[in-house]
Amino acid sequence: MTLHFDFDEGSQGFVAGFADYPPAHEEIYELTSGHRALPPPLESQSGLFISGVNRSDDLFMFFKGSIDGLTPGASYGVEVSVEIATSTPAGCFGVGGAPGESVWIKAGVTAEEPVAVMEDSYLRMNIDIGSQSSSGTQAVVLGNVANSRPCEQSREWELKALESESTPAGITVADDGRVWLLMGADSGFESRTEVYFTRAAVTLTPSPAG
């Protein structure tokens, strides 16, 4: 079973969230999100926009949406893919890491709703998304936000398709028949990142345990 999400048509029920930052100082992170038209030359399309300024060595910016109507107790293997729009060129240097190659796009499907919870003075994800370039058991690295343009050229927004990957862990559907698709940007670049999520796809393959 493969499900496709086209965010040109609207938010599809997806909502934004942020983690790996201290909420007491949220204003300096300049966290922004919403469904909006893409910048030129892609202005004929729309997508889910998310942006923030990484000031803490790490910042996770994400969207989540529910997938309903599954059989409770069924088990599945998970493959995910996304398409993004990015204006970040390749091969640049930046504080903490490259603005393109050190911002990793991750996605996964979970039975538990992914939320940011307080841990000491920071908000952390309640699921295992891994850390920066490393996948977690519940979210896999699909690529980064660097586009095809070299750093020496002027910035231009481009679409970038990130190929499907399997998450390390499968899922078992909860009693409510609902699972959650998570897609986000895990930043090691200590400045502003802006990215649009334009499409996503999820393939659920019944596993022997189901």
Stretches with model-predicted labels:
Residues 104-151:
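Beta-strand-rich interaction/scaffold domains
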Residues 33-62:
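Surface-exposed, low-complexity/disordered Ser/Thr/Gly/Pro/Asn-rich loops and linkers
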Residues 55-71, 160-168, 197:
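Short beta-strands within extracellular/lumenal beta-sheet-rich domains
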Residues 74-91, 183-185:
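A short beta-strand element within beta-rich, extracytoplasmic domains
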Residues 1-28:
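Extracellular carbohydrate-recognition regions
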Residues 143-167, 181-192:
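Short beta-strand-plus-loop segments that form exposed binding edges in beta-rich domains
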